[in-house]
Amino acid sequence: MVAKELPADDEVAAYIGNLLIDFVHVDNLYRIRNYRGKRLEEVGEMLVESNPVLEASSFEREREVRKHIDDYTLFLTGMFPEYVATLPSRGLRLDSLIDYVKAGKESYRIVGAFDQFEYRHVAPLFRRLAEQFEYCVHGLNRVKSDLEALREEQYQLWKKNLFDV
């Protein structure tokens, strides 16, 4: 389904397909925890956690959290744009002030800048994801439409869990 909606780049389509598989387990949406063990549910909190000057204990931690921000924002803007659209009206929350597309693109760029040693081979993929972020969002919107047409059980579970948080 993903390859059909994102046919231009097989590696990007495979990455996004794996992202959807990973997020089948809703707990994976919120896998990032702060140093106290608190689950981070907002991109604003994740951005603070990823900053090596503030919370991130290492550049490895910065990369880990930034990669999650990328995936999280891409997933939500692509599969649940109606949820993202409600964020500004949800009161005094960090995420009411954050542009998910900009945060996702910036984080993919940062992850793509980690291009040494073990990350040398995957860095170009993350740079392409940054460049093609909106295209990927559109592709995921089309996947969402396909899933809704099928009344896919997992899509309905994701949707229920998001709006119940």
Where are these regions (language model features)?
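Long, non-catalytic protein-protein interaction scaffolds
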Residues: 1-137, 142-144
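Helix-rich, well-folded core regions that mediate interactions or catalysis
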Residues: 156, 160, 164-165
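Intrinsic, low-complexity terminal and presequence regions
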Residues: 138-141, 149-156
